[in-house]
């Protein structure tokens, strides 16, 4: 099973995160399938590759709680629903 999860990058006291599609059995810093976004909580910046995220969601990937909150804020789920109807 694939999950959309945050992968920590950056340096001490200055964390930034990549949003990645990764196998559920892999560690947080393990090999990812694809990088689909970027999140900087300090500057409150987010970059999302929406077509890649929609692809993984349609294939059954499950976002973690934090990633789901980021996707809701960016209104990604509104783009997903019309395609499924």
From Swiss-Prot:
MF terms in GO: structural constituent of ribosome
Pfam families in the cross-refs: Ribosomal_S16
Keyword Ribonucleoprotein listed: yes
GO CC, any one term: ribosome
Principal subcellular localisation of the protein: plastid
Domain of life of the organism encoding this protein: Eukaryota
Matching SUPFAM superfamilies: Ribosomal protein S16 (SSF54565)
The keyword Transferase is annotated on this UniProt entry: no
Coiled coil: none
Entry keyword set: Chloroplast, Plastid, Ribonucleoprotein, Ribosomal protein
GO annotation, biological process: translation
Xref: NCBIfam families: S16
Membership in a protein family: Belongs to the bacterial ribosomal protein bS16 family.
HAMAP family in UniProt: Ribosomal_bS16
Protein name: Small ribosomal subunit protein bS16c
Organism (species): Nicotiana tabacum
């Amino acid at each position: 099973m694939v999950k959309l999860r945050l992968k920590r990058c950056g340096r001490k006291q200055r964390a930034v995160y990549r949003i990645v599609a990764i196998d559920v059995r892999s560690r947080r810093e393990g090999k990812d399938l694809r990088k689909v976004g970027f999140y900087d909580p300090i500057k409150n910046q987010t970059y999302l590759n929406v077509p890649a995220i929609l692809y993984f969601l349609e294939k059954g990937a499950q976002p973690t709680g934090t990633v789901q909150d980021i996707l809701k804020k960016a209104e990604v789920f509104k783009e997903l629903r019309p395609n499924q109807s």
